[in-house]
């Protein structure tokens, strides 16, 4: 068989069975509903492992239960012992022996046979042979599958604990695939998750590299379930996602880029996951800077100086550049998938929004539309607010063309975003014009927006026309019933004169 030369000898060090002892005796009975508790241990020294002169072990606890009634008992028949003896002699093919005794072996006896050949001193190659035969004969029920999957997971776990090479772990998955062991989950994802749970993320990266090398060089692919396929990112995408969940955004991006630059080819969706990590990194940076500014205003920390500002902008630009590179690779690898193009522009849009790059974000909005992926209305509003804060007049005009086709509630929300964008950028004259435009349209701006504009206009009064604009705004708000009568105080320094006017 294909796996006979590479798989190891798997053994059990300790077995505790309520009705089953390591040394089997005839006339011994097992209750079908009894619980079988096994501590399985793997010692591999055969095949490739034997050639390396390695000696390791794998342990796991497995519980086997039966759904049969409590009162029944099942005798271990003569066929079971004869099959064990024949298999141990290794004078005939295991499949021939099992085929000959098929009608004499119950499901429980076949489970015990799998356990038996995993014992210390037994050749666990027979375990795989027995399971493969069961699979071929369609005799793998839920309990047998659960037992075999647990054995394999335990072997993988111990290999990882003992810091075995990534190719040895992958070889084990190949053996699993060869014998037809296909659990309802992705074994590839399970292995990566085990690496991460044990805090061995660097080893997980090496394992993923081994997977890509085997796939690209020899065509080996272990799917096993819908995990990676469902996520469409494959093992690279899954590991990047694990890094991202743990908050290690830079590591997720570094890994995907390093794999690509080393000549390996991650799946197209893994680039999208890495781009999501960049979005989260930029968003985290923005939150940190806002917190820093808040602490600086409170006097807890010093203000950001010019040198720090340059470093921040440099880091942000470098992060965006990496995102653009990932986008290029994603488009190259996903040319046959139209949906990927739209998602790429969506990720780029999110990146530019987090970085506060208005014109670039607007460009991605239109590219998303051209790719057939309609952006949400809120994204339009956010981009427009960023452009307003940077006084990008042309971009704001283009984005405002949607307003005339909106209902009153949606229109109010969009204009509120525009107003807040102007306020954030310190453009209070434009904010006041937007405020008046909302009032003229019968839309009452929120109280906090009105206050922000009024306070900003007050601070900006320096020229005669600033006074006129402020007084005009006060009168317009009063006429709309949004403020009470206003007392406007003005001091003329030249004449040392105070002028008070009721509006």
Curated annotation (Swiss-Prot):
Provenance organism: Arabidopsis thaliana
Calcium is among the record's keywords: no
Gene Ontology terms: cellular component: chloroplast
Transit peptide location on this chain: 1-50
Principal location listed in the UniProt entry: plastid
Protein's recorded name: Pentatricopeptide repeat-containing protein At2g30100, chloroplastic
Family (UniProt): Belongs to the PPR family. P subfamily.
Localisation per UniProt entry: Plastid, Chloroplast
Keyword set, alphabetical order: Chloroplast, Plastid, Repeat, Transit peptide
Transmembrane intervals: none
Ranges of the PPR repeats in the UniProt entry: 341-375, 376-410, 411-445
């Amino acid at each position: 068989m294909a796996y006979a030369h590479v798989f190891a000898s798997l053994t059990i060090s300790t077995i505790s069975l309520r009705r089953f002892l390591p040394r089997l005796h005839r006339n011994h009975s097992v209750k079908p509903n009894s619980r079988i508790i096994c501590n399985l241990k793997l010692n591999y020294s055969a095949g490739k492992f034997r050639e390396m002169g390695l000696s390791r072990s794998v342990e796991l606890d497995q519980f086997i239960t039966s759904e049969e009634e409590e009162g029944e008992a099942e005798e271990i028949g003569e066929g079971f012992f004869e099959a064990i003896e024949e298999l141990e002699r290794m004078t005939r093919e295991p499949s021939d022996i099992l085929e000959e005794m098929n009608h004499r072996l119950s499901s429980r006896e076949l489970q015990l046979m799998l356990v038996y050949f995993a014992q210390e001193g037994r050749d666990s190659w027979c375990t795989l042979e027995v399971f493969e035969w069961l699979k071929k004969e369609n005799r793998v029920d839920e309990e047998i599958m659960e037992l075999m999957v647990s054995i394999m997971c335990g072997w993988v776990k111990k290999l990882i604990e003992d810091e075995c090479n990534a190719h040895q772990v992958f070889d084990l998955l190949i053996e699993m695939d060869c014998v037809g062991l296909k659990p309802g989950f992705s074994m590839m994802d399970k292995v990566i998750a085990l690496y991460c749970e044990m805090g061995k993320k660097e080893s997980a990266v090496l394992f993923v590299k081994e997977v890509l090398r085997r796939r690209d060089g020899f065509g080996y692919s272990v799917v096993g379930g819908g995990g990676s396929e469902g996520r469409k990112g494959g093992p690279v995408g899954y590991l990047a996602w694990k890094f991202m969940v743990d908050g290690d955004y830079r590591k997720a991006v570094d890994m995907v880029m390093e794999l690509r630059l080393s000549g390996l080819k991650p799946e197209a969706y893994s680039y999208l996951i890495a781009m999501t990590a960049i979005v989260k990194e930029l968003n985290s940076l923005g939150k940190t800077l806002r917190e820093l500014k808040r602490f600086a205003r409170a006097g807890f920390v010093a203000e950001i100086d010019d040198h720090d500002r340059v470093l921040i902008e440099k880091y942000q630009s470098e992060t965006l550049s990496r995102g653009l590179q990932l986008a290029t690779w994603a488009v190259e690898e996903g040319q046959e998938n139209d949906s990927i193009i739209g998602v790429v522009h969506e990720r780029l849009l999110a990146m530019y929004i987090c970085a506060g790059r208005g014109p670039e974000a607007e460009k991605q909005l239109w590219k998303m539309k051209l790719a057939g992926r309609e952006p949400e209305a809120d994204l339009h509003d956010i981009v427009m607010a960023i452009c307003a804060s940077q006084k990008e007049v042309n971009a704001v005009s283009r984005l405002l063309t949607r307003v005339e086709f909106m209902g009153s509630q949606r229109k109010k929300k969009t204009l509120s975003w525009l107003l807040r964008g102007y306020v954030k950028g310190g453009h209070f004259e434009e904010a006041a014009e937007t405020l008046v435009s909302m009032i003229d349209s019968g839309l009452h701006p929120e109280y906090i927006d009105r206050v922000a504009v009024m306070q900003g206009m007050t601070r900006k009064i320096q020229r005669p026309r600033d006074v006129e604009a402020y007084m005009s705004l006060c009168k317009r708000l009063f006429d709309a019933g949004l403020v009470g009568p206003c007392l406007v105080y003005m001091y003329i320094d030249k004449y040392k004169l105070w002028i008070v006017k009721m509006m």
